[in-house]
Amino acid sequence: MAVDQESFVHLSRPLAPNVLGFGVSNAPLTVNIQPQAVFSIIDHAVRRDDRDTQSTRVIGALVGVRSEDGSEVEVRSTFAIPHTENEDQVEVDVEYQKNMLALTLKANPRETLLGWYTTSHELNSFSALIQNFFASPETGTFPHPAVHLTIGTEAGATIDTKTYISAPVAVSPERAAESCLFIEVPHKLLFTDAERGALGSVAAAADAESRSAPVVSDIENLAQALETVSDLLERVSGFVGEVLDEERDGNHALGQYLMNALSLAPKVSNLAIENDFNNHIQDVLMVSYLANTIRTQIELSQRLATAKLDEGKEGGEKKDGEGAEGDKKTDGQRGQRGQGGKRGGRSGGAGGRGGREQREPREPREAAE
């Protein structure tokens, strides 16, 4: 009688090569991804040139920060890496990757290389080769494991993301460089309330024919947010009602999540909530009024400063013209005075000569006897 036996693969930790002096944490790895990194990857996929490569995917490097124990990483930015790929081989521009990484780390010294991304969910021997390159001590993230992010960029499809780390497997030394086992790790997208609003505006432009959406004011944005919350509450209420009426099966995880959310609600009366909401609205209106007043004052001061500069330039030009004319008149008067003085002096000299009285001739004296 044959006995069914299951096959197992034994993996030894750490996931990176064990070198004296370097230790890797055994804690589970969590990957956090910023929205700008996803947009950068999508932009790279849209702008790829199909004439230079037969590959339908693009690759690039992931840059971000890592926690002290190495159990959590945050992908903040990415940059593309040129590569060519066919059925037989794959070529990566290593020099370009080194130069771009040096420039990126120079601009953001606190960040570091985390791994690489691709726009295909397929994992093959080329993926293992690139993964080992980014995890190597010379050019990679050693002693920490390299993160591999795959993202779907098909037109009209949902953007699906997955993250992996790798572990070495027992293979021959000749194929060690192109062999590894990809292990999927949890990940999540991080975005703030401001980024959520920006993403909502971008999503609203997707359904418009002009592919553009106006930027709404704070009051309109608040009204839209309240409408969204009201719709979500109606959906949750309908779901709970259907579960209570046994029209659909319940979900224990969702029920626990709703219980936790309700427990976080403050235990205050409706009147107090309404008063707080009205106070918040007044604060928002006051901030908006002050912002508009400051903006108007800045524009007015700029216009006044510009007008004063223009008046100063015109006054300076007039003074320069009057000064030049005055200098010319002064020089002319000095010339006339000089000529008159010379003439007067000559006349005076002639008058001096003519003013002498002529002596009468003396009679000869008789000789004394």
Swiss-Prot record:
UniProt GO molecular function: metallopeptidase activity; translation initiation factor activity; translation initiation factor binding
GO cellular component: eukaryotic 43S preinitiation complex; eukaryotic 48S preinitiation complex; eukaryotic translation initiation factor 3 complex, eIF3e; eukaryotic translation initiation factor 3 complex, eIF3m
Predominant location: cytoplasm
Compositional bias of kind Basic and acidic residues: 309-334, 354-369
PROSITE patterns for this protein: MPN
Superkingdom assignment: Eukaryota
Bias (Gly residues): 335-353
Family according to the record: Belongs to the eIF-3 subunit F family.
Protein name: Eukaryotic translation initiation factor 3 subunit F
Species: Neurospora crassa (strain ATCC 24698 / 74-OR23-1A / CBS 708.71 / DSM 1257 / FGSC 987)
